[in-house]
Design a protein with these regions (language model features):
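Positively charged n-region of N-terminal signal peptides that target proteins for export
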Residues: 1-5
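Active-site-surrounding "flap" and adjacent substrate/cofactor-binding loops of secreted or lumenal enzymes
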Residues: 38-41, 46-111
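Short secondary-structure subsegments characteristic of cysteine-rich extracellular domains
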Residues: 60-82, 211-228, 498-504, 597, ...
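Noncatalytic, helix-rich "gating/capping" subdomain that lines the substrate-entry/channel surface
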Residues: 85-373, 377
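Hydrophobic/aromatic-rich, well-ordered segments within soluble, folded domains that form packed cores
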Residues: 32-53, 182-204, 392, 567, ...
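Intrinsically disordered, low-complexity linker/terminal regions across diverse proteins
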Residues: 224, 253-257, 275, 279, ...
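C-terminal motif of bacterial Sec signal peptides marking the signal peptidase cleavage site
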Residues: 13-16
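Bacterial signal peptide processing site
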Residues: 18-20
Length: 671
């Protein structure tokens, strides 16, 4: 790899152009920079300091960055679309009518507040009418069909070892606060106290007798579930998450919970093969179910129902949920406006119907063509990087090339749109009843895939989502329409900025196919070992250097980044930068672009990358994300990543002694 860069670096080191005559729209806003900071000292602050000053943290956010600015714009667009649709009186039964009905019900605060917790009553009555654990198993099955996540979760997706078929998977779930550490670590005592107070409040709003006792019972069950739950780091071990068995074996493996009755109640036929993601969790969960008094289990199930419903009921419920989950846990000081909450539901439940309208109005076909050109250039550059690796032998390289060549690329929007005709929305029912019906439809829709081949035309993300993904079991990379706009992509901006922004995003997702998890899958999306023992050890050794680099970062006083939890994302960041930079340099064909606003093309590449991660963030969110998120914080996705690239040092004349400099022997670039 180093030899490849050496062939490229001299080309731009000789560039000394200074005029601005290329006719391109500037992709860098000079007002976003903070020139009082040297790029040699803190490149993130230099590239984003002006933007950070102009975009203070909004009270409805714990973190506000360029992603959020674009997401806000999209929400405003969608809200205008929904409002316009309502004025046109859409046809009964149409997707437009379903979207409008859901939006209007969510906006009707008068009705929601008048109903209070009444929409929940029949569901809670069903819980408290349960007379024995056999009946509770049946109720859990019914609630899972309605989209609830009490005790554990189920879903249908590709078999990790045979991606040609889809199987049922069972995974840990059922924790209201989300992460096991909140229940078990001493440092989170205040969170536990706040959660108990919240549960007691919503139990009281729901008319439950002795709400404090019910809250304590529910919390006790959740704590025991937390004790047997896997950590976030354990859940990154893909191989450990694959434990196939038949449905008939479940009762023997996990006595205490009647899975035979559960499957019959859900009308799921006997399965010769399914996957249990966390064996030890299910052993603990089934033991807990058998050994816990029925009344405690009922309070737990009731708590899950109320908690999952609280954001969609009256203002009293929503306020209680906001005060705990947003204000206490994330430091957010202001609720999102109702229209944002309202449009989020149809945007989620009928995502592709919304996406179809969004694409027609806001996504030019020319953008798809330009992005595909960038993708193809990155694919070529990635192949060159594989060829240049001095730590990988030819047999492993051949498998890597085969996987790269077999990538499925999805850009903008699906070729086949999802059919929502079977989804029924009835405004005469409560908003909550409609959400349950919609969730039931989603679960049933997922279950129809059981035993069938994966539909490769399906998308795992809607076109209006500001994000991108790589799926290892389909070996596909996907870039929705919403992310293909400034600051990520601008068809009129110079290539340097586009390669630094959307190019790195594309390279990031490509590299996920070869990170510490993605590398375990072959070109067809099957989990299989295509690495020689020596190459496997070489990869792990390089990855360990990266772990230590990020472990050394102090995020807050006494709190360090978790280099192992974020390893996959950090590998992808590094790969994205490395591959996109090579693709950009290749695209120049030896030519030297003229400088724009005094910045060389190489400098603009790195500025384009850094600007993607500009953000304001409070300390509560920094701590939460550092401990729970597999992504590094924005500042570290810039400074920590770029310190590994000689091309970055050359672009900004960074040398030994400068704070941004990292000695060559401490750097690592895997791809």
């Amino acid at each position: 790899m180093r030899n490849t860069f050496l062939l490229v670096i001299p080309l731009f080191l000789m560039c000394a152009c200074s005029s601005d005559k290329n006719g391109k729209v500037p992709g860098i806003d000079l007002g976003d920079l903070d020139t009082s900071v040297s790029p040699k000292d803190d490149f993130y602050a230099y590239a984003n300091g002006g933007w950070i000053q102009k975009n203070p943290l909004k009270p409805e956010y714990a973190r506000y960055g360029t992603f959020d600015v674009l997401n806000d714009l999209n929400q405003e667009r969608l809200n205008a679309m929904f409002t316009e649709m309502g004025e046109l009186s859409p046809v009964q039964g149409s997707d437009d009518k379903k979207i409008v009905d859901l939006y209007r019900m969510a906006m009707d605060s008068t009705r929601l507040n008048a109903e209070g917790g009444a929409p929940l009553k029949k569901y809670l009555d069903e819980v408290y009418a349960v007379a024995d654990k056999a009946s509770l198993v049946k109720l859990v099955a019914k609630l899972h069909s309605d989209g609830s996540s009490c005790f554990f979760g189920t879903y249908v997706d590709s078999d990790l070892m045979d991606s040609s078929v889809q199987i049922l998977s069972l995974g840990q779930s059922g924790l209201g606060i989300g992460d096991r550490d909140y229940y078990l670590d001493e440092e989170y005592a205040d969170i536990r106290e706040g959660y108990l107070s919240y549960l007691s409040k919503v139990f009281e709003l729901s008319g439950i007798e002795q709400p404090q006792q019910a809250a304590e019972n529910a919390f006790a069950v959740e704590t025991r579930l937390a004790e047997v739950s896997w950590t976030r780091l354990q859940n990154r071990d893909i191989e450990a998450l694959y434990n196939p068995c038949s449905s008939g074996q479940l009762n023997t493996l996990f006595p205490g919970f009647d899975f035979d009755t559960y499957f019959k109640t859900r009308n799921i036929p006997a399965q010769d093969k399914l996957n249990v993601e966390q064996n030890s969790f299910f052993k603990g969960m089934s033991s807990l179910f058998a050994g816990t008094p029925l009344e405690q289990l009922k309070d737990y199930v009731a708590a899950r129902l109320i908690d999952e419903a609280s954001s969609y009921l009256s203002d009293e419920y929503y306020d209680a949920s906001f005060d705990f989950y947003s204000r206490q846990m994330r430091g957010v000081t202001e609720k999102r406006p109702r229209w944002k909450r309202a449009m989020a539901v149809p945007n989620s439940l009928l995502g592709e119907a919304v996406g179809k309208m969004y694409v027609a109005k806001y996504f030019p076909e020319s953008s798809k063509e330009k992005v595909l050109e960038i993708v193809n250039n990155l694919r070529q550059a990635f192949g060159e990087h594989i060829d240049a690796l001095d730590w990988m032998d030819d047999s492993t390289k051949a498998y890597a090339h085969a996987k790269l060549d077999n990538f499925t690329v999805k850009i903008g929007y699906p070729d086949v749109w999802k059919d929502y005709s079977a989804l029924s929305i009835d405004p005469s029912l409560s908003y909550y009843d409609n959400l349950i019906a919609a969730a039931r439809w989603q679960v049933a829709d997922n279950m129809t895939k059981l035993g069938k081949p994966k539909d490769k035309t399906e998308w795992g993300m809607t076109p209006q989502t500001v994000n991108a993904y790589y799926n290892p079991t389909t070996n596909e990379i996907c870039f929705p329409a919403a992310i293909l706009q400034p600051p990520f992509f601008n068809a009129d901006a110079d290539d340097a900025v586009n390669y630094g922004a959307i190019g790195v995003v594309i390279g990031h997702e490509m590299t996920h196919g070869f990170d510490d998890e993605g590398r375990l899958f072959d070109k067809n999306g099957n989990m299989t070992n295509w690495w020689t023992a020596a190459d496997d050890e070489a990869f792990k050794a390089k990855a360990e250097i990266l772990v230590k680099q990020y472990d050394a970062i102090e995020v807050l006083p006494g709190l360090h980044a978790d280099g192992r939890l974020s390893l996959g994302e950090n590998i992808a960041d590094h790969g994205g930068i490395s591959i996109s930079y090579s693709a950009f340099m290749n695209s120049l064909g030896g030519e030297c672009p003229e400088a724009i606003d005094g910045f060389t093309a190489q400098q603009r590449f790195f500025l384009g990358y850094a600007h993607v991660w500009g953000q304001n963030i409070n300390d509560e969110e920094k701590e939460r994300l550092t401990k729970q998120d597999v992504h590094s914080l924005g500042e570290n996705r810039v400074n920590a990543a770029l310190r590994n690239f000689q091309s970055f040092f050359d672009a900004f004349d960074i040398k030994e002694g400068d704070p941004m400099f990292l000695p060559e022997e401490e750097r690592v670039i895997i791809w």
